[in-house]
Amino acid sequence: MIKRTVKNIAEMVKGTLANPQYEQTVIHGVATDTRKLEQHQLFIPLKGERFDGHSFVEQAFEAGVAAVLWDRSVPNPPENHAVILVDDTLTALQQLAKAYLQELGTRVIGVTGSNGKTTTKDMIHAVLGTQYRVHKTGGNFNNHIGLPLTVLAMPENTEIAVLEMGMSAKGEIDLLSRLANPDAAVITNIGESHMQDLGSREGIAEAKLEIINGLKEDGVLIYIGDEPLLQNAYSCQTKTYGTGTHNDYQLQDVSQSEEGTHFTIKGIENTFFIPILGKHNVMNAMAAIAAGAYFGIAPEDAAKGLSGLKVTGMRLELIKTDSGLSIINDAYNASPTSMKAAIQLTESLEGYGKKMLVLGDMLELGDLEETFHKECGAVISPDKIDRVFTYGKLGAFIAEGALKHFEKDRVSHYTEKKDLLQAVKENASKGDLILFKASRGMKLEEIVKDLIESPLS
């Protein structure tokens, strides 16, 4: 983590030390949340819609922080403490992270995309970790606050930082890219997430491509070459991956089992293995292999790193319960692209009793939300899936789409989670496989937790 004197911090954020007697005070790390404070940290009070962190500065000092930033427009900065006056505390947080990166000379990989950012970040970390000291975004700390905090938590001996870059509107990736100044930028895909804010997939592609704006002059853009919206000639160096013959990394063979997925790439002798399911995760792994190659990681080392992959939870997580159920917990988030991929994956797996889907609302899809939900229901094969359970206001449209092919008694919709849980329990038996997939706000993991902890009906 960052360790600097208050004088150093003031210089890095272009601020003014309110009381020079504290200039040699040393801070150890940064925090913006008083609920997570540690002694000797720098507390940065941020202004939100419902609160102003400046109101908690005295509490922060009582908790043992060494210093705070203070917005000049806020009256009455605390006396007899190390206080750095700045024009805007959020901007100062971002400036501090940028300056810290520049001081250390750490190389950076930025990762964005509609789906798969976190998994791809984890995979790149696994590949690069075979040869380098690597720091990565924790969880999905990927916005204008989370990314700077990730950087400032980075050990000083970090050689490469893998930074996830999320967005909900145009301009956000631009800010993050210019802050991080990446050596390599990865775009995992262009989906439908944030359609509500960006209007179209074309708008989403434009927003994701902002990651190029901060790319170093000799940097590389790594992206899925099968995506028509990413077919332009880019001024930077590029590497592509996918199934098409035009890609630099072309997928050859894929095979799946409960243990994970094996795959090969044309022109590379190694067979790669990832301990997670899904062809879309193979694409994410190929992005990691390409990123690793850019930093000099040989295919055999990339294969070793990927085989030991540890991914962030609730992303196609295969769980075996004591009751004999197999559960695919993919409840962290959902978009039409990722939901269809999860459905297809479940359909492809063999050796189970019944195969069932529990699908809920996909949020932030804008005017096309009804259409997207119906499409997801319509792709489900009645020959490969035994039962479909849907949940939520928009989940009803998934059920409507599924009923184009399914008998009515094989598709059920629920508006109450307790009723959904009861129905799943009544229909599930030892040896069955159940997929859970919905947007984060639907909290389907609550049902997964109940199925793990309690016996079937």
Curated annotation (Swiss-Prot):
Reaction catalysis annotation: D-alanyl-D-alanine + UDP-N-acetyl-alpha-D-muramoyl-L-alanyl-gamma-D-glutamyl-meso-2,6-diaminopimelate + ATP = UDP-N-acetyl-alpha-D-muramoyl-L-alanyl-gamma-D-glutamyl-meso-2,6-diaminopimeloyl-D-alanyl-D-alanine + ADP + phosphate + H(+)
Cellular-component GO terms for this entry: cytoplasm
Major location category of this protein: cytoplasm
EC number: 6.3.2.10
Keyword Cell division assigned: yes
Keyword Flavoprotein (UniProt): no
Binding site for ATP: 113-119
A molecular function GO annotation: ATP binding
Pathway: Cell wall biogenesis; peptidoglycan biosynthesis
Keywords assigned by UniProt, alphabetized: ATP-binding, Cell cycle, Cell division, Cell shape, Cell wall biogenesis/degradation, Cytoplasm, Ligase, Nucleotide-binding, Peptidoglycan synthesis
Pfam families: Mur_ligase, Mur_ligase_C, Mur_ligase_M
GO terms of biological process kind: cell division; cell wall organization; peptidoglycan biosynthetic process; regulation of cell shape
Compartments it resides in: Cytoplasm
Cited function: Involved in cell wall formation. Catalyzes the final step in the synthesis of UDP-N-acetylmuramoyl-pentapeptide, the precursor of murein.
Family affiliation: Belongs to the MurCDEF family. MurF subfamily.
Name of the protein described by the UniProt record: UDP-N-acetylmuramoyl-tripeptide--D-alanyl-D-alanine ligase
